[in-house]
Amino acid sequence: MAEEEVGNSQRQSEEIEAMAAIYGEEWCVIDENAKIFCIRVTDFMDDPKWTLCLQVMLPSEYPGTAPPSYQLNAPWLKGQERADLSNSLEEIYVHNMGESILYQWVEKIRDALIQKSQITEPDPDVKKKTEEVEVESEEDPILEHPPENPVKTLDLKISEETQPETEELPPVAHGVPITDRRSTFQAHVAPVVCPEQVKLVLAKLYENKKIASATHNIYAYRIFCEDKQTFLQDCEDDGETAAGGRLLHLMEILNVKNVMVVVSRWYGGILLGPDRFKHINNCARNILVEKNFTNTPDESTKNLGKKKVKKDKKKNDH
C-alpha cells in the first residue's frame, strides 16, 4: 500500500471514530469493509419536521485526492432542491480539498433542514420513491408474472402510541446480506398469525438504526385464516416500485403461510436495473428455506397463540 493510501486510511479511521462519538446511534455502519456509512439528519426539533439520510462511501483516495461518494435519501427531496443541496456539499469539498469533510456535510444538511422547517410544512402524503427506473427482466419467471390483482397496503404507522400491547412479538431472524455494486440487500423473517404482529415486527425492526435508515424496506406477509380457509395477505414497496408485489408473488409460489418477510435495501449509488428484484427475491427465498417456512410452515406458529383474524379491507386469496 502506498504511503499516501496509508495516510488516508488512518485519517478515515480517525474521522469515522469522531463521527461515531459526535452523533452516537445516528451514525450507522452499512459495510465496514467497503467503508459505507449512513447518518440520519434531522432539523434538531423535538418532533422533527424534516429528516434526511446521508449515505457515504469513502474511497481509498479520500480525503487526500478524492471526495466521498454520497447518496441523499429523502422522500421529499427532488428537483431543484436536491440539486441545490448536492451543489452545497460539492462546494464544501472544493473549498476543503484534502481535508476531512463529513462533519461539515452533515451540519450543512442540518442547516438546510432547519431553514426548510421554518418556511414549509411536510406533505403527509409524500412517499419514498425509488432511485431507479422500472425495468422488466426477461430472465426470471417470477419477475415476469407479478400478482394479477395488486393488494392494498396496511397503514402501519410505527409509533409507541399505535403499537398493540395484547399480541406477543414473534421472534425475528436476519438473513445473510447480499452486496452488488455497492447496494446491499438483507432479508428478515418472522412468523405471524395476525396483522397486529406484522406491526410489532416492523416496529421492532425500525428500532435498529441501520434498518431504519435503509433506502427501502420492502415487505410482504401471508396469514392463513383457518375459520374461513382463506389467506390474508399484503405487501409494501416502500418506494421500490413493484418490489412488494413481486415478493408476495414469490411467497405464493413457495406456498408459505403465517410468515412475513422484510427485505432491506441500502442503495449504493449505482443503478442495478432488474437485478435488484432478483436480489430482493433471492434474499427472501434463502431465509424462508433456511428457517424451514417452505417445508413446515405450521411449526413456527404453534406457540404464538392463534386468534381469529378479520378481513379488515385486505385481499383474501383462495
Swiss-Prot record:
Biased composition (Basic residues): 304-318
Single GO MF descriptor: protein sequestering activity
Domain annotation RWD: ranges: 14-116
GO biological process, one term: positive regulation of neuron differentiation
Similarity comment: family membership: Belongs to the IMPACT family.
Functional description taken from the UniProt entry: Translational regulator that ensures constant high levels of translation upon a variety of stress conditions, such as amino acid starvation, UV-C irradiation, proteasome inhibitor treatment and glucose deprivation. Plays a role as a negative regulator of the EIF2AK4/GCN2 kinase activity; impairs GCN1-mediated EIF2AK4/GCN2 activation, and hence EIF2AK4/GCN2-mediated eIF-2-alpha phosphorylation and subsequent down-regulation of protein synthesis.
Name this protein carries in UniProt: Protein IMPACT
